[in-house]
Amino acid sequence: MNFKNIYLIFFQFLKARYNFKKIRKKSIVIYNEDSSQLIADFLDSADYYILDTSLKYINFRILLKSFIKYNFKWKPKFYFYTFLSELSPSYIITMVDNDLKFWNIKKYIKNTETILIQNGWRDNLLDIFSELSPREYNSFNVDQMFLFCKKYEDLYKKYIIGKTHTIGSMRSNKFEYSKNTINEVIFISTVKNTNEESIQIKPVQTVFPLLCKIFKEKKIKFKVLGRTLPIDPSEEKFYRNMSNDFTFINKSKEAHKCYKYIDECRLVISIDSTLGYESLSRGNRTAFFTIRGEDLENKSTNFGWPNKLDDLGPFWTNIYNEDYIEKIIDYLL
């Protein structure tokens, strides 16, 4: 553990709110608050526990117990494993499918069944698979994995021993498709932080001014669906610095509204967002300008990865070419 990581952990523990509650056993644990409500909607409210993995709230009694148990080998993950042991659940479920700590739970807690539900489109550039190597094939264990597609089944099974199932997106599946087409185009923002490295924002800076120009000329209303929650004014400002020829829609805490926005528009445009792939699966006309990996020679951000598809397709391009982008838009409109 390097000095930077030690500092970050120390700072997290300093900010945390502590309690001394005695933990009662639960038959089901939802690992990580992210998307926990989606899982909780299917469960008896009295029968599950949501484990906070952000270290915002720390049970001091569990923390002390983990220090005693693991002493000089202690790492933050051992706090979570000790907490899970105390809860002694029959099932541990997560929608944070790219958390290595979850992949490792079975090494520390034997008498429980782990269930992983894929929550987002993955790559090996900025996501979980960039942290793994062939040496880690079959190094992890998750009992049941519910994934977007067959190709993801093949990918996860390289590293994780367990059963896989294709279900698409659980979140998208929950909300009914209701098409009421309006003559508008919506762009799905992938910008979380305008101070991010250029690898995050460069594709948007490259393609967005062109899109504004195209739809202004076509006299079609162009909208941007924001990404940040809580709402960050700098996200809209980032787009306004490139053009004013669009309407900005802040992301809603109500998940169903995102699907309403994409379902009602004539055309949805995405760089490489999960919502873009969900839009396609819902039968919406969806264009993908997956140009993030072009300069980096990284294929995992290409359209449809881990499938191996051509760089140019009827509704996608992995290469920035203004004429081809306009051709895709004309085809889909």
Residue positions per predicted region:
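Active-site and donor-binding regions of nucleotide-sugar-utilizing enzymes
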Residues: 6-18, 28-172, 276
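A short, charged/proline- and glycine-enriched loop
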Residues: 18-29, 87, 177-185
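Conserved catalytic-core segment of nucleotide-activated headgroup transferases in glycan assembly
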Residues: 39-42, 46, 170-240
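Catalytic donor nucleotide-activated moiety binding site of glycosyltransferases and closely related
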Residues: 53-65, 187-188, 212-254, 298-305
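Short, charged, surface-exposed secondary-structure boundary motifs
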Residues: 58-64, 124-130, 173-179, 257-260, ...
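Donor nucleotide-activated moiety binding/catalytic core segment of transferases
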Residues: 76-78, 227-282, 286
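Conserved acidic residues
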Residues: 89-90, 143, 183, 263-267
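Catalytic binding pocket for nucleotide-activated donors in carbohydrate/polymer assembly enzymes
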Residues: 166, 239-243, 274-333
